[in-house]
Regions:
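Phosphate-binding P-loop
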Residues: 1-8
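Hydrophobic anchor at the beta1->P-loop junction of P-loop NTPases
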Residues: 11
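The conserved Walker
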Residues: 15
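Conserved lysine of the Walker
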Residues: 19
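Hydrophobic positions on the alpha1 helix immediately C-terminal to the Walker A/P-loop
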Residues: 22
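Conserved substrate/cofactor phosphate-moiety recognition/catalytic segment
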Residues: 27-68
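Conserved nucleotide-sensing/catalytic segment adjacent to the nucleotide-binding pocket
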Residues: 52-101
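A glycine- and Lys/Arg-enriched "phosphate-lid" helix/loop adjacent to the NTP-binding pocket
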Residues: 96-145
Length: 145
């Protein structure tokens, strides 16, 4: 890719919508045709096994920092592809806010979203479809409904 601009891609969507699969397939395809990309997987998966689900806005703030750290480590010439959109941490923090003090984390995450936009961090945001909208094989992560 003859360009001085990196093109970073994030895949967003709800649980079990194929974000990781889509990101991995895109990464493999771009590598096969000669582009230099890093694949940055969802950091919370690694920590969820040890600590359980992250719900509080302050836990979302922490996960933002962990995920962002991995994105900033990317050195690939053409950019990175990730299956964990930082914006979703703000959305989930706002959703799970229960106490008045939670608004501190929610406000800070909103500010960080604005900084992402100012930095033009993501050049493409791909939205994974709802698994009920597209036919595909069932696996152990999805119910048989």
């Amino acid at each position: 890719m003859e360009s001085d601009k990196r093109i970073n891609v994030t895949v967003a969507g709800g649980p079990c919508t194929g974000k990781s699969t889509l990101a991995a397939n895109l990464f493999a395809h771009l590598k096969n045709i000669g582009f230099d990309y890093d694949l940055i997987e969802e950091e919370s998966r690694k920590l969820r096994k040890e600590f359980g689900d992250f719900r509080s806005p302050f836990e979302r703030f922490y996960m933002w920092r962990q995920q962002e750290r991995e994105e900033l480590r990317s050195t690939a010439e053409n950019g990175f592809i990730t299956d964990s959109c930082l914006y979703m941490n703000y959305v989930k923090a706002k959703y799970f806010a229960r106490e008045k003090r939670d608004s501190l984390a929610v406000r800070e995450l909103f500010r960080m979203c604005m900084e992402l936009e100012d930095q033009n961090r993501y050049h493409l945001i791909i939205i994974a479809k709802n698994p009920e909208e597209i036919p595909y094989k069932k696996d152990s992560a999805r119910s048989s409904d």
